[in-house]
Amino acid sequence: MASSYLSLAARLSQCWISPWSLCCLYILMQFFLFTKDLNTKIGDFVNDEQATCNYIQEKVDILLDSPSLIANAAVRVAKDGIQSTVKIILSGISDSLIAAENVFIFFIEFSYGTYLCLIQLAIDGILDAVADVGEEIGTAVNDTLHAIADEIEDTVSSLNEVFQSAEDSLEKVASWLGEDINLPNVSIPEIQSLRNFTLSSSYDTEFEKLKAGVNFDSAINATKAAISKPFSSARNLILEKVSNYSFDTSMVSSPNKTHVVVCSTDDLTAISSFILSSIYKIRKVVIISLLIIIAGLFLISSIYEIWKWCRIRHKAFLLDEHIRSNKFEDTRDLISYIESPISWNLKYFISALPLPCFLSVQLRWFITYIFHPPAAMILFISCTSFISGILQLVLLNNIREDGSVISALAQNSFHKVESALANVSVAWANSTNQIILKNQENINNNMFGSIHNTTLSLNSTLNTFMNELNSSMTSAFGDTFLASTVQNVMNCLLYRKIENFEEVLTWVYNKSHIELPLLPTDILSKSIDNQTIYSSLYSSLNSSNSTVSFSGIFDRVEKSVISELNFSFLFFLLWLLICAFGLIGVLSSWLKSLFLSLLDLVIPNPKENITLPVQSLAFPVTKSCRPPPIPPRESHVYDFQNFQYEEDDCIDYKRSLGLISLSSDLAIDIPISPAIISDIQFNSITTESEETTYLLKEKQDRY
């Protein structure tokens, strides 16, 4: 190599080494190590998942065996409940039959008693009436007969007197005739019997016999016997069935045992493959993206190096022109430009804004301060850690979404177990209910058949009686005016009571059956509620049998990533603290300037300050002070303000001067006057030819 500066090829060989590319490489390596560690943890989880699956299967088998135990207990409870229900119902029906029998007998006795009372009342009335009338008739008859007997006797006496007179006359005549005439005396011996006759009081004996004969006891007893016989037989049958009834549990079968596979090796393989493939896809996308970004940064850095190479070559010849045009208000600004052209261009852009001069300078200083290499390094560390953590969280969130397959496994297991229990419960409940219905049918047919027959027979008898009675009444009275009256009387006295009895019999007929309670279809599945199933399966997924749980992996890794993000946030806070220091510096500078301005207004200074175009001098200089002498040529000090290049000299310099490679080379190639250090700008008057000769000689000696 003919020179010590770096050529374009040397520059391009290191163009990939930049803060941005190093940041991307750091993120890439950290993300790669993160995914590798995550794959290892997930592999451990998949290896232990089989044990967890077996544990879940054991829990599921226990849950699926529980219906048989519940069914046995339910059958025993149902047996006791049905037997107690049947006994209570049949005992109640037996009591109802007794009550119905007594109601019937009461009605009959009531009806018989009513009519008996009416008949006896009528007979008693007749007897009383006859007795009163008979007594009066007897007295009248006896008196009349006595009077008649007396009248007859008087008449007979008169007749005898007449006959005696006639006999005397006839005897005189007969004596004349020589005949003996003897007329008989008229006598009625029955007159004494008539006088002694009295009307007997035994004429009402028949009525008394009728009264004594009006007695319905035999009819009532016969009716009681006729009515009590079917009721007693029905009641005895019910009591016999009650004492002998027992629910046959041998007919009830046990629930069918079922088996549900909640997870298998294929499922576990599919789940692990799915999660690992998701991690692989995300890692591939992130790595490819980072590699593309690094390649783009490499291309940009290469273009930037080429552009900077050409720019340095061009700026090397125009440097004096820039200095001459006072683009750099301060010589230290030139050094800043050489060290960091991007930062200087940003400051130059800010200076172009329509801001006050002091504010523009302070803003440029603040940007330089917060992006100074130490502060920029802290900001780069913070951003790099933050981006790396965000990428890791994105990967975790995507895997967490993919990990919902594990939750879906538990959920599917939950639905499978729930569906299996529901099917077993429905099948067993239906078969058991059929047996209960069969027992119910036997009870209704065997125990209540006689009650049905009795009530139907009584209803039929009452209907026949009413029809026959109506026919008799119709045939007796026909279309006479008494038909309606008799019908109303019969309706009042008999028909309504018979209709009420028919309603009672109908009610007994309708109620003379039993309805046994049926088992609900969810009797087995409802006993094991959904929360119990889900809690059992979920606890199995996170049981102690599994050394690594899916949620535990995410929790630990997420905590680590969050800690990294917290550290990046701390670095960012540290950079913000540096920004605060910069703001404090800007504020203190502004206060200092304000204080000096106020001080100049209050206390005028007779001396003039020799100042730079922007910053104030560190010490005052009087007006009459002359500048220091021109330093000797061997001190390598040049006047940057008044130096002029000739065109030929620039051409010779272009041929003889080596290309400036770096900002440090540029700083070495162009020595800076000591006046920069002392904050004093020297505007020395020098001869152009001497300066040009010295510059060319110096450069030829160096290169």
Swiss-Prot record:
One of its GO terms (biological process) is plasma membrane fusion involved in cytogamy. It is found in: Cell membrane. Keywords: Cell membrane, Conjugation, Glycoprotein, Membrane, Transmembrane, Transmembrane helix. InterPro entries: PRM1. It is a multi-pass membrane protein. Glycans are attached at residues 142, 185, 196, 221, 244, 256, 423, 430, 453, 459, 470, 510, 530, 542, 545, 566. The chain crosses the membrane at residues 15-35, 103-123, 286-306, 376-396, 567-587. This is Plasma membrane fusion protein prm1. It comes from Schizosaccharomyces pombe (strain 972 / ATCC 24843) (Fission yeast).
